[in-house]
């Protein structure tokens, strides 16, 4: 009996935030412009000092930088305010002192699907190339469950094919969940309230899957939605399933940016120049009449529009004057980012590529706390040289990881890797890196996860904004959680604002 198609299709372990979606961390740093454009003395009424042709963008991740580029092209004056001392938001490549032999790993947003056309177009605009990941990386990887170690293909073919068939039953049920939902308006679906009050766990429980199939499905959902299934709105799942493209298995998580994903936000920021102001966390927003005044990094900035291209979590520390409407404030307070963490270890030899089970790719699905892992060097480098193995922790595993120190988190994953791959036992891993996104002050998690009861209430608010304020970022797109989502959102907001008044 043949195993199922790629058992991690659709949102296949996406921070890949998405990510995640979705979207990760970026490694560019710089200094603030000595005279940031749009700086002014504080005014009593934003409408009096507002720059009619200026847009203030908060956040220099892919969403904010995309919006800024489009707005500049449309004739707007733009100021981009970034709280960190680097651009990129949740796109961050770790290299340099962290690893040797020129190796690098993505701490945040990682893989690109073949249908991520807006992101690929942006890469093409800046002359950046991609490098391919192995087409069969998942089925050629390792599944470690209850002491059993098999290739994922063999595991899925277990019980004379019943495991794979049961796994596919989950996805067949998703096909029937809400086949006529409009992903642009999930809140208007006729069963919106019913689905929104239910969790993904409720849906999976009703299927009564075989334990092995449930293990694979839970791994899919935990990685894809950056949370435990009981924390995810079923209406959000229906929306994401509806918007997903029908991509062949080899086209999912197919590539990375050659040389590191952080090159894209760096190139975008370089083109924008000194309109990007770093080390400028926003503390206050005044919004009235025909403009806004933003206080950030000790300076004030007047504009006609404000684009908040950042997660909602850091906005909870911003003072809005007057207070935002109740529905907007509730969405900002309620929409969380799922916890996500990555741990990357450098090994002198890629022991995972020659496993006794026949697994060769390094892609790992395990019932140990790390959950999911893959080779961060499966798209470049010497196959016979040193390599990087990265754990991607989400859900409960990520919450536990966030409670640990970096050293504790690394040591725990190193032990778990040695259990999953006994041949790694004793290999020295002096070169390591980790990021727990829930502990990142200006992010607060991996990528957005609407809880039960939130989609119908929050989605219209997220898309519409309020007054002179608009929202961008992966959490605002029909397809959520990807770097592609962030780029799409930037294009969308810029198109909504159009051209400046003459």
Placement of each model-derived feature along the sequence:
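FAD-dinucleotide binding site
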Residues: 3, 10-25, 35-502
